[in-house]
Amino acid sequence: METKPPIPLAVLVGIQTPDVDDIAHEASLAELGRLVKTLGYAVVGTVSQKREGTGAALLLGSGKLAELAALTGGTGVVTSMAPPPKSKARQRFEGAAEGAAPPEPDPDAARRPEFVIVDHELSPSQIRNLERATGAQVLDRTGVIVEIFHRHANTREARLQVEMARLKYVAPRLRESSGGGGRQQGPGAGESTLALDRRKIRDRLAELKTQLDAVQRDGDQRRSARRDQLRVALVGYTNAGKSSLMRALTGSQVLVEDKLFATLDTTVRILQPETRPRILVSDTVGFIKQLPHDLVASFRSTLAEALEASLLLFVVDASDPTYESQLEVTRGVLREIGADAVPSRLVLNKMDRLDPAARAALRDKHPDAIMLSAHAPGDVSALRDTLIAFFEAEMVEDTLVLPYAKQGLIGEIYESARVLSEDHDETGRVLKVRALPAAITRLKRSLAAR
């Protein structure tokens, strides 16, 4: 019978700086725990400390560092001379060499945490110091997010974007392997192993960029074809319920999981029941605080769905006590890509998780927000009506004359506009339509072309 490997264990580490209150600090650590769970690890402990900042070489004070090392089985010593923790094989070997009886097996030692996950971005030297002190592998928040993105990327574009971000994260954290600093390889005279590795990364990044540019050109062409269509983009913090709402609005079988970053690729579906003209709904990658800048830059083309949408729906988990800061993170990322000028509506999701008093307080605070549960058909139907009304206000009526020689364009007209009436005369079909001004302009251009 095949046995599954044990679930990796991890300890979380958080620093609470003076500008962060207790609620925000605890929420951030809880979010980090969910990120770690998404990686498939189990959180078995948390070490937290109030400090002025996160820039110190030791990160933690000596007492908290000792507490962390006790959990992981490390020495708690942070110096370049600190010996690495001895493996069980090394302990058995040294015990046999000295003729000593082997130590009694420690039932807890096998389950000591292999990972220390820090809720901040760390410098390479901080990572090395903590690894020496704890004997565990150290990941910072950025490293965890990059790894999750790497595992969840499905499309070619997403995989290319994530690999670029991952290499940019790894490059400054490379260091010489033990005994490797003196080796010289490669075409450059005196090129060390480290320099060679970094050069390989630079070459790979250049190769990835070329491939990504080609993929994105294809994506730009697809988006250009949808430019004058009715488009709604769901944007918001990760795990706010965007994919559940997407499924409810479109009837599509998009992935819905209680995991952070379950969706990395933009999905475009048609609002159901279908309208004329059709309304397209996009589900975009979720945001998170301290989202690595390289990941934001890498996903700029994916987020172009938000930039080019007619309407943004800011989907928020109303049951989360930190929803306001999550909303600000979303708005901040959209400002960064230039999408802050797109018309938007606030959608307070998961209202079914709140008691009547909390719901009333939210109504007072956000009187213009759309309040719903993605799992309540009545709420979803009301949102659909709101979307239709938004686009109706943007549409105009006009008359199109379709020559008999161009009857092949009738499908495009019915797809891009609502046909209110149809007559015939000696020139062709005379169609009274209602559509967005840009769509009517494009259709008239097509009809006038030879």
Curated annotation (Swiss-Prot):
Principal cellular location given in the protein's record: cytoplasm
Binding residues for GTP: 236-243, 261-265, 283-286, 349-352, 373-375
Pfam families: GTP-bdg_M, GTP-bdg_N, MMR_HSR1
Residues involved in Mg(2+) binding: 243, 263
Disulfide bonds: none
Sorted UniProt keywords: Cytoplasm, GTP-binding, Magnesium, Metal-binding, Nucleotide-binding
Subcellular location as annotated: Cytoplasm
Free-text function comment from the UniProt entry: GTPase that associates with the 50S ribosomal subunit and may have a role during protein synthesis or ribosome biogenesis.
Descriptive protein name: GTPase HflX
Species, as recorded: Gluconacetobacter diazotrophicus (strain ATCC 49037 / DSM 5601 / CCUG 37298 / CIP 103539 / LMG 7603 / PAl5)
